[in-house]
């Protein structure tokens, strides 16, 4: 018999199954998947997102693999800000890309503040994200920056910079136009 929490999760999975055909994917945090059997019916519609350091699981390749083992058809949602928050060297992201090659279905792009809230992309983080973002070509990207309407265009430009190719030496050689008056 299911306890109340398990019953709620099962009911959520059932409700999401009803709309699965109408959507490209359903992103779930790893810690929301206590019983993979509830979610297995959704197959490749499930995208399991890596977590930031506040979460109990899904922060590392090993933790994410434990969840994905129970969901053989699920894809991975790589949140670059989350992995950067967990490991600023981005080595963990490279481990994730190696372990889950071919399963990455979506990339989330943003910057986190100290409280792990989504913030606008800044030029400094773009350089760091660019080292990894280029390894997931032809993947849907969700820009998670929380900005006002006037800042959307600049956030899109910064997001595009994350996916520009590196030069022959493997370094970044690009410039970002500064606003007039600076």
Task: Name these PLM-found stretches.
Residues 1, 28-33, 50-52, 144-147:
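Structural motif
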Residues 21-28:
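Metal-centered catalytic cores of metalloenzymes
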């Amino acid at each position: 018999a299911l306890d109340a929490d398990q019953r709620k999760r099962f009911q959520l999975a059932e409700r999401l199954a009803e709309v699965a055909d109408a959507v490209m994917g359903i992103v779930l945090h790893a810690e929301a998947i206590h019983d993979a059997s509830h979610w297995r019916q959704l197959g490749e519609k499930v995208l399991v997102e890596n977590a930031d350091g506040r979460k109990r699981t899904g922060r590392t390749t090993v933790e994410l693999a434990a969840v994905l083992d129970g969901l053989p058809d699920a894809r991975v949602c790589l949140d670059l800000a989350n992995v950067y928050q967990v490991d600023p060297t981005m080595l963990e992201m490279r481990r994730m890309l190696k372990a889950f090659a071919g399963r990455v279905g979506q990339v989330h792009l943003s910057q986190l503040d100290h409280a792990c809230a989504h913030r606008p992309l800044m030029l400094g983080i773009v350089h760091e994200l660019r080292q990894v973002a280029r390894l997931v070509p032809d993947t849907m990207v969700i820009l998670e920056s929380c900005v006002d309407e006037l800042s959307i265009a600049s956030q899109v430009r910064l997001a595009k910079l994350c996916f520009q190719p590196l030069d022959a030496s493997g370094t970044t050689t690009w410039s970002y136009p500064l606003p007039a008056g600076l």
